[in-house]
Amino acid sequence: MCIRDRYNPEHQFLASRGYAVLSMNFRGSTGYGRNHVKMANGQWGRKMQDDVTDSVNWAVEQGIADPDNVCIYGASYGGYAVMAGITKTPKMYKCAVNYVGVTDMGLLFSKMPKVWEIWEEQQKIEIGDYDNDKEYLDAVSPINLVDRIETPLYIVHGVRDWRVPIQHAQKLRRELEKNGKVEGEDFWWMVKTDEGHGFYKEANKMELYTELEEFFGRYLKDS
């Protein structure tokens, strides 16, 4: 589900621009033992997200973060955490970047990759069983909570993504527009036809990080 934090060039990129970077190993992250992983079972959008919120509050209390200057950025499950963050705690973040993130829990199950079918029963334990847990999963599905979004949002995805299909981003874009959000004012959109679950081509990475530097700089003020 999530991997233990380690050296990450994105962290260094952001830190080199003067930002304090907080990357937390919320429950479900590997590297801290089986119990830490199992604590995440059935907790998407619940206690897993509370771990993120609590970490931000801790950073504020420690004087590391300015409560008026916090952005949230994540990829894959981290992208889901971004969406959960700006729908569950919409006042907490000045801006947000959802990078190849899950937005629709129903779509996550209906579009599950063939190679993951052997893990289907484990997925039901870790995330939930959509046939039996539909009410819970719909309640923590960001696509159903778009009306709560107040935070400027950058959506980044690859058309060839087989882990989190492009439909997650496309549905989110449509729902934002249905709720009166305007591209270029309320949300931004970067999709690459030659990328999958993350950008790997140098030109695309350069474009992405140039855009992110400008985006964060627009909303995070010197304090």
Map each language-model feature to its residues.
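Short, small-residue-biased leader/transition segments that mark boundaries at the very start
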Residues: 1-3
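Active-site-proximal cap/loop segments of hydrolase catalytic domains
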Residues: 5-17, 23-223
